[in-house]
Amino acid sequence: MATTELHIEDPYNAMIPGSNICIGGKQDQPLSNLRFVVKDLFDVADMPTVAGSPDWPSTRPVPDEHAAIVTQLLDAGAKLIGKTITDEISLGILGENKFDGTPENPACPGRVPGGSSAGSAAAVAGDYCDFALASDTGGSVRVPASFCGIYGIRPTHGRLNLDGLMPQAPSSDTAGWFARSAETLSRVGRVLYQEDIPDRLNHRLLIARDAFAYSGSETQTALAPGLNRLSKLFREVTEVDMALNGLDQWSEAQRTVQAAEFWQTFSDWIDRHNPRMSYSVARNLFIAS
């Protein structure tokens, strides 16, 4: 696949400086007419993975191959046009980055875009590309999608190949993606899931009452038509309570495990290299330790 330089206007500060490339995908494939960007946690061959940190790339070799999911998208015909800004080592939920700058929110100028997949969300909302690759450990696809008014999906953990993605908390890490339309979101999903999805599913749909109860009335009203359409695709629909002891306990457990795992992920790097960090990231790592 040929790699060439490509100039992209970046009014929303979504892109990593110097990452304006064009890697052409295969022809006559399901995604051949689509352009995409990737969050700068995914390896792209011959480009440093910066991960939102001034010292991460200098302590890691430049990758000589693409992340597995990037290769999958290129093989499906999509054209890669650059890498996007992330919260520092992906530890953030607002999209702020002291070193690379904070991407603008195209949907709401003057507000943060959400993180940590901030640049990927801004690039899609700002019409740089058709879709963007991102990651989600504790909300890093879902929050930016909400803030920027676009579609985003966090697949089931373990569903997609994460080889070539910088880990944060492995028991929660997933890849995900953004798009401006449901049709594009679906096209990408059919490629990444590597299976045909029938028009009607011979399975049961479980609707988590306790989870929906956490949403405000406006959110529940907005979701109702989509939930009704989704219900018609399944053989059986059942309402359940996911957490018998309450979702607050699940949330607290997830935060505790995630903090312990990201300390395991980064502690050796910190001890060896004493990297520069923003106050908020240093504080979070100190608490996790």
Task: Write out the residue ranges for each language-model feature.
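Amidase signature
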Residues: 1-26, 30-31, 194-289
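Short, well-ordered alpha-helical
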Residues: 1-62, 66-67, 89-92
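Acidic-leg catalytic submotif of subtilisin-like serine proteases
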Residues: 32-41, 72-76, 81-83
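Short, flexible, mixed-charge acidic loops at enzyme active sites
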Residues: 47-49, 90-99, 278-282
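Short, basic, glycine/proline-bearing loop/turn elements
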Residues: 51-57, 102-108, 287-289
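Flexible, glycine/proline-enriched loop segments at strand-loop-helix junctions
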Residues: 57-59, 107-108, 172-179, 208-218
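Conserved active-site and cofactor/substrate-binding residues in soluble primary-metabolism enzymes
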Residues: 64-68, 118, 145-148, 180-190, ...
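Short glycine/serine-rich loop segments
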Residues: 74-189
